[in-house]
């Protein structure tokens, strides 16, 4: 956990850091060379805490609602539940990290450097693992929806509970393993490129599947329109509504995740270039966007379900 230097987030250590302080933030890489004036967005600790707490509450409610309602005990909602757990871990790690850093800076918590380093490693693994698992479950949800549309009659024989369980177990195991290796070898170029390639693969998978689903939905809409002789209004409505949904799904994904992975790419491509250094200075902003994704995910993938919203109301009533 970097307690020195201008960068306060754990994943700031993903950059190439100076030998004297290998776990400091990206801004520590900057030298006294003349370069372009940089716009650095400062993210207050209070904002990190607020985002983490909002995400924490949202995702706890999603998990509680799915656990309470047996009608939601299906592979589709299990994937949504695991996505909520992944986002929950992102929130928990962020809240814990921010709280510990504030206590250390205020002198209210005394800890040896070795203890802080071990805590740093644990937090790094937790954050990286939750990020990897979150991306995996976003892809799994896309695959599940694709199968439900294109193989509707065979869906329940293809996506069974045992298969979904094995997929979920594999994702969690792979996330823990990959995050551990990533933190251990974060200074290797191949590791950073592997993580960036994984993000690009997930983006391509989601884009291909959702675009294909949109095309099938519009094709089905045109078929219905021909039967009712209302072709043009239906086609236009299908295109606008489908494009809006697709824009929300992929737009939010890109907005929240792409800046962070662009940052990793630049760490590999131009670690010492002044212009890239301007990007490095905003790593806290990129991590805040990742946390924002944990807030938006329940709104897109969970709360749109009428059954889940009804159960959520029951959970809230019981809590009061």
UniProtKB/Swiss-Prot annotation:
What family does this belong to? Belongs to the G-protein coupled receptor 1 family.
Judging by the UniProt lineage, the source's domain of life is Eukaryota
What's its membrane topology? Multi-pass membrane protein
The cross-references to InterPro entries, in alphabetical order and at most eight, read: GPCR_Rhodpsn, GPCR_Rhodpsn_7TM, Melcrt_ACTH_rcpt, MSH_rcpt
Q: How does it assemble?
A: Interacts with MGRN1, but does not undergo MGRN1-mediated ubiquitination; this interaction competes with GNAS-binding and thus inhibits agonist-induced cAMP production. Interacts with OPN3; the interaction results in a decrease in MC1R-mediated cAMP signaling and ultimately a decrease in melanin production in melanocytes.
Q: What is its main location?
A: membrane
Q: Which gene encodes it?
A: MC1R
* A Pfam family matched in the record: 7tm_1
> Any stretches that span the bilayer, and where are they?
41-66, 76-96, 122-143, 167-186, 195-214, 244-269, 283-303
Query: Could you tell me the keywords of this UniProt record?
Result: Cell membrane, G-protein coupled receptor, Glycoprotein, Membrane, Receptor, Transducer, Transmembrane, Transmembrane helix
Q: What does this protein do?
A: Receptor for MSH (alpha, beta and gamma) and ACTH. The activity of this receptor is mediated by G proteins which activate adenylate cyclase. Mediates melanogenesis, the production of eumelanin (black/brown) and phaeomelanin (red/yellow), via regulation of cAMP signaling in melanocytes.
One GO CC term on file: plasma membrane
Query: Where are the annotated coiled coils located?
Result: none
Q: Which organism is it from?
A: Sus scrofa (Pig)
Instruction: State the compartments where it is located.
Output: Cell membrane
The residue spans the entry assigns to the Extracellular side of the membrane are as follows: 1-40, 97-121, 187-194, 270-282
Q: Membrane: is it a keyword of this entry?
A: yes
| Annotated SMART domains | 7TM_GPCR_Srsx
Q: Which GO terms describe its molecular function?
A: melanocyte-stimulating hormone receptor activity
Q: Return the protein name.
A: Melanocyte-stimulating hormone receptor
> What Gene Ontology terms for biological process does this UniProt record contain?
adenylate cyclase-activating G protein-coupled receptor signaling pathway; regulation of metabolic process
Q: Where in the sequence does glycosylation occur per the annotation? A: 32
Per the UniProt topology annotation, the Cytoplasmic ranges are: 67-75, 144-166, 215-243, 304-320
Phenotype upon changing residue 102 to P: In allele MC1R*2 and strain Jeju native black; may form a constitutively active receptor
Q: What is the effect of changing residue 213 to V?
A: In strain: Jeju native black
């Amino acid at each position: 956990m970097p307690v020195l230097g201008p960068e306060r987030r754990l994943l700031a250590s993903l950059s190439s850091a100076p030998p004297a302080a290998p776990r400091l933030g990206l801004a520590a890489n900057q030298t006294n060379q003349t370069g372009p004036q940089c716009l650095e967005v400062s993210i207050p600790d209070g904002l990190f805490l607020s985002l983490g707490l909002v995400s924490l509450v949202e995702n706890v409610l999603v998990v509680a609602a799915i656990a309470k309602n047996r009608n939601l005990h299906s592979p589709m909602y299990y994937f949504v539940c695991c996505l909520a757990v992944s986002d929950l871990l992102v929130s928990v790690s962020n809240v814990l990290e921010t709280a510990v850093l504030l206590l250390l800076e205020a002198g209210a918590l005394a800890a040896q450097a070795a203890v802080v380093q071990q805590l740093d490693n644990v937090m790094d693994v937790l954050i990286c693992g939750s990020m990897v698992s979150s991306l995996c479950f976003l892809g799994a949800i896309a695959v599940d929806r694709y199968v439900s549309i294109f193989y509707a009659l065979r869906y329940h024989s293809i996506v069974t509970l045992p298969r979904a369980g094995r997929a979920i177990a594999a994702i969690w195991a792979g996330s823990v393993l990959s995050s551990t290796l990533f933190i251990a070898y974060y200074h290797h170029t191949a590791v950073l490129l592997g993580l960036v390639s994984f993000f690009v693969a997930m983006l391509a998978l989601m884009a291909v599947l959702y675009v294909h689903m949109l095309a099938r939905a519009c094709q089905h809409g045109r078929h219905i329109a021909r039967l009712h002789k209302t072709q043009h209004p239906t086609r236009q409505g299908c295109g606008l509504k489908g494009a809006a949904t697709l824009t929300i799904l992929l737009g939010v994904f890109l907005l929240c995740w792409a800046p962070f992975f662009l940052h990793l790419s630049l760490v590999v491509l131009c670690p010492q270039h002044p212009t890239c250094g301007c990007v490095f200075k905003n790593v806290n902003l990129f991590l805040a966007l990742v946390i924002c994704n944990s807030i938006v995910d329940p709104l897109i993938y969970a709360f749109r379900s009428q059954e889940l919203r009804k159960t959520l109301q029951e959970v809230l009533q019981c809590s009061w």
